[in-house]
Design a protein with these regions (language model features):
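Buried, small/hydrophobic-residue-enriched core segments of structured protein domains
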Residues: 4-58, 67-69, 105, 111-120, ...
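An N-terminal, globular interaction/scaffold subdomain
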Residues: 85-90, 125-128, 132
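Short coil/turn segments at secondary-structure boundaries
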Residues: 99, 167-171, 185, 447-453
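Residue-level "edge-of-site" marker
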Residues: 229, 317, 341
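Short active-site oxyanion
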Residues: 253-254, 312-314
Length: 474
């Protein structure tokens, strides 16, 4: 632990800013003015040491996941555009420099370097929406050593979270078998920034919309919504609540029918649906949020169909995940769409993916780590994917950058940033389309929720030989 020179070995680092002053100075939001400080302290102390000793030659770091989380057979690339936008705009402003100076840790020369800091490096990456597998490099950063070091925390924070959510969302979308899946997670997400990123990652993987209005404005994602039980309870009775809402929103009303009794609720919804039709409106859907979803959905569908309302859809919500959705559909639930919240936004069964960022090459040659259980692959690399005649992926090859396997392989990592500028920002719709195509191409056995097969990822002969030489020379 780094501490002030006058502190004892057990004293924690303290800044010149008191907790009371800090509490009144900033509400704690992360934005362009302070995101450069969203880093671990040792990134800055290491970088200052590099600066003092003239160690700022070009270096390459790789971001990768060591192993699949429990219950996962594949991962989905997400968060790249967010990360690249942060790299483009990364600045240490006057307030940040003032705070760092107050820590009495950093050399004046290094603080001057930070004041003029701009990220000038290159990034190669597996595009957003693409499926990938450990230990393939998700991205590689090649930049002056200090630049590449300083962005580690920011990249891991951004990529780990969005890959985690996208990979969970993909499983939910696949389990829904073509039925709509809506992100309804903001109130359960781990913070305001997380809620935005969840909506984006979920939309990439095929979710049809989000309840998060800010995400709709920011990313152009369709926004969706129903009503809460509190709305129904705010009126004299359920029928009055439904009628009022239908009058206010005659073209997109979704009625929550389980506040008191689901079958009584659908009876009231049928009354309102006929009243809406008489005035040119149309009831879009009813929502069931509790109880025996399977039995209730069948009964509600029967009631709606019997009333001539076959076009009215049924939306289910209530602690859903891919396992529950698959079970409901297997048992014949009558449902058109799912609203998923907590399980999606927190990836409850696999709440982290353990992505790491490691030095793999610099001007002195290959760099590597041999620690037991944490060994790394040296050198800049490319991932090559092989497909069968039907276009299904059948195996990946991790190779050194200058290797060229046979023509049946397709490279995955592409240039996404050069000279600190994004090469070609992609519209979110294009990323979403790519992900839909990639998920559709996966073999069924890889999409299984349980007991999925292990996808083959191998090392090229040259990379294997290099790793063997390194181990032998240790």
């Amino acid at each position: 632990m780094t501490a002030h020179a006058q502190d004892g070995p057990h004293e924690h680092l303290r800044s010149a800013t008191t907790p009371e002053a800090a509490a009144g100075a900033d509400p704690g939001y992360v934005g362009p003015s302070n995101v450069a400080l969203l880093t671990d302290l040792y990134e800055l102390t290491m970088s200052d040491s590099y600066f003092r000793h003239g160690m700022n030659e070009r270096a390459t770091f790789a971001l990768f996941v060591r192993a699949l989380p429990p219950g996962r057979a594949f991962l989905v690339s997400a968060g790249m555009d967010t990360a690249l936008a942060m790299l483009e705009g990364l600045r240490f402003g006057d307030e940040a420099i003032h705070y760092l100076r107050s820590l009495r840790l950093f050399s004046d020369g290094f603080l001057d370097y930070l004041r003029a800091f701009r990220f000038t490096g290159a990034v190669r990456a597996i595009p957003e929406g693409e499926v990938f597998f450990p230990p393939e490099p998700l991205l590689e950063v090649s930049a002056p050593r200090i630049e590449a070091q300083l962005v580690e925390t920011l990249l891991l924070n951004t990529m780990n979270f969005q890959v985690m959510v996208a990979s969970k969302a993909a499983r939910i979308v696949l389990a829904a078998r073509g039925r709509g899946v809506m992100d309804m997670s903001p109130r359960r997400d781990h913070g305001s920034d997380a809620a935005l990123k969840v909506a984006r990652a979920a939309y990439i993987t095929g979710c049809t919309g989000t309840s998060n209005v800010l995400a709709g404005m920011t990313y152009g994602i369709p926004v969706v919504g129903t009503m809460a039980h509190s709305y129904v309870m705010s009126f004299a009775d359920e029928l009055e609540a439904f009628r009022t809402f239908a009058r206010d929103f005659p073209n997109n009303a979704v009625l929550l029918i389980d506040t008191y009794d689901t079958m009584h609720g659908v009876a009231n919804a049928i009354i309102v649906a006929h009243e809406m039709a008489a005035t040119g409106g149309r009831l879009l859907a009813v929502r069931i949020d509790s109880g025996d979803l399977l039995t209730q959905s069948r009964a509600v569908r029967s009631a709606l169909d019997g009333a001539g309302l076959r076009s009215v859809q049924i939306l289910m919500s209530g602690d859903l995940n891919e396992y529950r959705i698959a079970e409901l559909l297997e048992q014949g639930a009558a449902v058109d769409a799912f609203g998923v919240g907590t399980e999606l936004g927190t990836s409850a069964d696999a709440p982290n993916i353990g992505g790491v960022y490691k030095l793999v090459e610099d001007e002195k040659g290959y760099r590597f780590k041999l620690s037991t259980g944490k060994a790394t692959l040296p050198g800049r690399k490319q991932v090559w994917r092989r497909f069968d005649a039907e276009g299904q992926p059948i195996g990946d090859l991790i190779a050194l950058l200058d290797e060229r396997p046979s023509a049946e392989y397709r490279p995955l990592l592409v240039p996404v940033m050069a000279g600190g500028r994004r090469v070609r920002p992609e519209p979110l719709t294009d990323v979403r389309r790519r992900c839909t195509e990639r998920l559709a191409s996966l073999p069924d056995e890889l999409c299984a929720l349980d007991d999925a097969v292990t996808y083959p990822v191998t090392l090229s002969p040259a990379l294997s030989a290099l790793r063997a030489r390194i181990r032998a020379s240790d």
